[in-house]
Design a protein with these regions (language model features):
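Nucleotide-sugar donor phosphate/pyrophosphate-binding loop at the beta->alpha transition
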Residues: 1, 37, 138
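Short active-site oxyanion
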Residues: 3-8, 80-81, 152-156
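Short, well-ordered alpha-helix to beta-strand connector turns
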Residues: 4-6, 96, 116-117
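A short, active-site helix/loop in glycosyltransferases that binds the activated sugar's phosphate group
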Residues: 4-28, 88, 162, 166-167
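Carbohydrate-associated surface elements
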Residues: 14, 33-34
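Conserved catalytic-core segment of nucleotide-activated headgroup transferases in glycan assembly
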Residues: 36-112
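Nucleotide-sugar-dependent
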Residues: 110-151, 157-166
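A short acidic/histidine/glycine-rich donor-binding loop in glycosyltransferase catalytic cores
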Residues: 170
Length: 170
């Protein structure tokens, strides 16, 4: 079906390469990162040495999609995770004090109220690498949550092999 288009707007150069490897031959334009339009402003700040380190994750929270979330308390016991989204399966968490489940919050409200050190972009089965189908997709995908975190004035934690990793590093 893509071959019916004149031009594709793709997320990034890695997605462009992947599509070419799949046989797509028409022109492509790389978006690089999504805009995030919002009248909301986040003026909250955190000192680098302030404890605990607070990390937000916004998105689908169910075990099937983000199995790694349910293993974080094995390695991140001194951090606190604020989870925004739906379908968090709290019964699968060992140490419930590590997580603050905020539920679904409209994006403008989240931008104004979030108070954290980092935003996390990660998906898949493992806390060590983005694995599984959803994790591997990070190699060519630009998650919209990256733009949300930037709009919240948050530095981003991202897998080193993710398509947006070089953008985040810059």
């Amino acid at each position: 079906r893509l071959s019916h288009s004149d031009v594709l707007i793709v997320h990034n150069d890695k997605m462009e390469i992947w599509l070419k490897e799949q046989g797509y031959t028409k022109p492509m334009v790389c978006l690089e990162i999504f805009d995030y339009l919002s009248p909301s402003v986040n003026n909250n700040t955190h000192e680098p040495n302030q404890k605990p380190i607070k990390v937000i994750y916004a998105g689908a929270l169910n075990y099937r999609k983000n199995k790694y979330l349910y293993s974080l308390n094995d390695v991140m016991s001194k951090w606190q995770f604020e989870l925004y989204g739906k379908r968090f399966e709290e019964d699968k968490i060992k140490d419930k004090t590590l997580f603050k489940f905020k539920g679904f919050v409209p994006s403008d409200q989240l931008i104004e109220q979030v108070s954290a050190h980092f935003g996390l972009i990660w998906e898949g089965d493992s806390i060590h690498t983005c694995s599984g189908d959803l994790g591997i997709y990070q190699k060519i995908n630009n998650p919209h949550k990256a733009s949300l975190y930037i709009r919240c004035n948050l530095p981003i934690i991202i897998w080193k092999e993710a398509a947006l990793a070089s953008f985040v590093a810059e």
